[in-house]
């Protein structure tokens, strides 16, 4: 019995497709080298193509043609041939989840990426930067206190600002932008009075 080959014809070039070079997308046969974007002629892969009415596009041109322009005429506007310089557009929610972030840590002012991000009171922090500014204690969402954007653990906050069981003085300090209480130097004990009964020899 002899091998008769395949009867499949490539949809793009209408030539016979041999099994070794066969690529089938949506039940349609193509040569691997004919599986190209109809706009930019870039070679496509099974995970990087889209098609509309049997016309193949790379993901970029499919989005540009159908999603952004809203046109289903399969024609690009004159002068709109895309190159490496893509149109400036806001990334989709899915795309932005993988493309990074513009959020800056309120403590160190460096970029905060989603895996290390902690957001409290509208501010973003690195998990490692979310610590007490007085003692450096690592904070949790249930163990922190903040005054004018400065983070404290509840223990140090109480030690620094609590007076006689009330936080009323905090309103005054907050209004005057005073964050830490005034530091009063410890008084040195007074030298003992000279002993009058002592005689110098």
UniProtKB/Swiss-Prot annotation:
Cellular component per GO, a single term: actin cytoskeleton
InterPro entries linked to this entry: Znf_LIM
GO molecular function: actin filament binding; metal ion binding
Keywords in alphabetical order: LIM domain, Metal-binding, Repeat, Zinc
PROSITE patterns in UniProt: LIM_DOMAIN_1 (PS00478), LIM_DOMAIN_2 (PS50023)
UniProt keyword annotation of Metal-binding present: yes
Disulfides per UniProt: none
Stretches with biased composition (Low complexity): 177-187
SUPFAM superfamilies recorded: Glucocorticoid receptor-like (DNA-binding domain)
Pfam family, one: LIM
GO biological process: actin filament bundle assembly
Record has Cell membrane as a keyword: no
Domain LIM zinc-binding: 8-68, 103-163
Quaternary assembly: Interacts with NEK3.
Protein name: LIM domain-containing protein PLIM2b
